[in-house]
A protein has these predicted regions:
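Append "and occasionally in soluble cytosolic enzymes with long acidic Gly/Pro-rich linkers
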Residues: 208-213, 261, 287-378, 382, ...
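Ligand-site clamp/hinge motif
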Residues: 212-258, 386
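Aromatic- and charge-enriched surface segment that lines or borders ligand/interaction sites
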Residues: 86-130, 151-153, 239, 285-286
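N-terminal lobe/hinge region of extracytoplasmic solute-binding protein
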Residues: 38-91, 122, 189-193
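Surface-exposed binding/hinge segments that line
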Residues: 88, 99, 133-177
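Detector for C-terminal structural segments
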Residues: 15, 26, 202, 268, ...
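A structural "hinge/loop" feature
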Residues: 41-60, 83-84, 110, 161-170, ...
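Gly/Pro-rich hinge or "lid" segments in bacterial periplasmic/extracellular proteins
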Residues: 64, 74-78, 167-220, 224, ...
């Protein structure tokens, strides 16, 4: 399936990338049923269930093209059948049941079975198996298979177990094939049950997919889909403007406004589940509550949205977007530079004697991410905070976050497309989560009981209370809910996906 090895691909990426970006070649390919996407991140791994890449929301567009989730999700975030045709709990929520489709085929032509479902869950549940949220999957065990129905005992109750089956690491892999080739063999030649099969891959350059002829969801609209890895936003703009790519995303908003009405192009820019935030890592100067709160009150979020993002975006003060189940509009952390100055003065800091620390950010991963951090650093400087900017790739962010080595402040885009507070505030702020930066016992005491709360109203209120406490303590700095800018050729029809995932098989088609 792969003409060259990944190592060879990395070595040769420069030359082949040049040929991939040639406009004439891709213009001709598009006419023949190929969709070319200038994508904003690279693909570090083909395993959608293990390692840091598995919890990167931006990669889900690719993973959901090659693999299938247990449970599907519509553009409005509601759930629908996928590999599971039905699912549920028993009355006292001590058992779960799942019915498996009988018309699903892997890319190698073999049939998907309930054993694949069980094996995938058990693999995810292994504490040393590399799944970043293994404890979620370890919540059910003692599986039994009767024809197409699977039953299991609930070992540790998790109210969002089935939501996770449509979320990060919730993918089913082929048991027989994976055990035959092993993890390295799977990386070299991955297969799934999704609408597209991997046809060719060149590290840091592109991924080419071809339609799965036996896909249970019907024939995909494009014979071939090419994800071109273009982390630089300026280059993505050039890709769509020159016609080298048919579609791109996460371009600067001024470029979106300029190009959306250009002949031959269209655009869509609507809110997604992506939240821009600054992680705050405990330790050093961040252990000072006055410093943390000053950081929060010194940032004029609305000004950033208006001036840098051309009005695209919504101010947030918690890690819950307006579409999330635990969103509470009464929790506010207002822009108040006078209060920020007063708080810093109480800890002995001023413009002449500023508190100093490093802030990390990506550059081009999200529209104006670096420029936004520059603006924030300027606002901080006005009240007595001197922050040094360090730029990194998003993959480095995951590496540092999972080892609790982020800088005192670090920009990130948090995606939570199931809208539950456990997958926003929970995983971002609970110290036992590998995705949290702030670790403290006082916050854990408020969050820990909520994981197993069976009363839904009490559970949601508990998360709202935790969000309020976090805001009062300044444990994280939420910035904004993003609107996702997508530009595409006018002969395409693109359906906005609130999750932010671009899905060539279902939400992109020929007009």
């Amino acid at each position: 399936m792969f003409p060259i090895t990944r190592r060879q691909a990395l070595a040769a990426s420069g030359g082949l990338l040049t040929s991939l970006l040639a406009p004439r070649r891709f213009a001709a390919a598009a006419a023949g049923g190929t969709l070319n996407i200038a994508y904003n991140v690279n693909l570090p791994s083909f395993d959608p269930n293990t390692g840091p890449s598995s919890v990167n929301p931006t990669l889900q567009s690719i993973y959901r093209s090659v693999f299938n989730n247990y449970i599907g999700q519509r553009p409005d975030l509601s759930f629908e059948p996928a590999l599971l045709s039905a699912w549920g709990w028993n009355e006292d929520k001590t058992k779960v049941w799942m019915d498996v489709r009988n018309d699903v085929f892997w890319h190698d032509g073999s049939r998907l079975t309930p054993e694949d479902i069980v094996w995938s869950i058990q693999r995810n549940a292994k504490p040393d198996g590399g799944n970043p949220v293994s404890f979620i999957w370890a919540g059910i065990d003692n599986f039994k298979i009767d024809d197409k129905r699977i039953t299991a005992d609930v070992v540790n109750y998790d109210p969002v177990l089935f939501k996770w089956m449509a979320f990060l690491t919730g993918y089913v892999l082929p048991k027989t094939y994976f055990e035959k080739v092993g993890p390295q063999g799977f990386e070299a030649k991955p297969i799934g049950s999704g609408p597209y099969m991997v046809d060719a891959y060149e590290g840091n350059a592109y991924l080419r997919l071809k339609a799965h002829p036996k896909y249970w969801g019907g024939k995909p609209p494009f014979d071939t889909v090419v994800f071109k890895f273009v982390p630089d936003a300026t280059t993505r703009v050039a890709e769509i403007e020159s016609g080298a790519s048919d579609l791109t995303l996460e371009v600067p908003y001024e470029e979106y406004d300029r190009l959306k009405g250009k002949a031959g192009l269209k655009g869509v820019c609507k809110p997604t589940c992506d939240l821009g935030l600054l992680f705050i890592t405990n330790g050093g100067v961040m252990d000072d509550k006055n410093v943390r709160l000053a950081m929060c009150h010194a940032v004029d979020k609305q000004s950033i949205i208006k001036r840098l993002l051309r009005g695209y975006g919504t101010v947030i003060d918690t890690l819950e977007g307006p579409e999330y189940a635990a969103f509470d509009p009464t929790i506010k952390v207002p822009f108040d530079p006078a209060l920020a100055t007063k708080l810093l003065a109480a800890s002995g800091y001023s413009k002449d004697k500023p508190v100093k620390f490093t802030i990390q950010t990506t550059r081009g991963f999200k529209p104006k991410d670096y420029e936004m951090i520059q603006a924030i650093v300027g606002m901080w400087r006005n009240v007595g905070i001197d922050a040094n900017i360090e730029v990194y790739e998003v993959a480095k962010h995951f590496e540092l976050r999972m080892t609790h080595k982020l800088a005192p402040a670090a920009f990130y885009n948090w995606g939570n497309y199931i809208g539950d507070p456990t997958t926003s505030t929970g995983f971002a702020m609970w110290s036992k989560s590998p995705h949290s930066a702030w670790h403290s016992d006082d916050l854990d005491a408020k969050i820990t009981p909520l994981w197993a709360e069976k009363d839904e109203a009490r559970r949601i209120q508990g998360w709202k209370d935790a969000d309020r406490y976090i805001a009062e303590q300044g444990y994280v700095l939420p910035l904004l809910q993003y609107a996702q800018p997508i530009l595409y050729k006018s002969d395409l029809k693109v359906t906005h996906n609130t999750s932010g995932a671009l899905l060539p098989a279902s939400l992109i088609e020929k007009a």
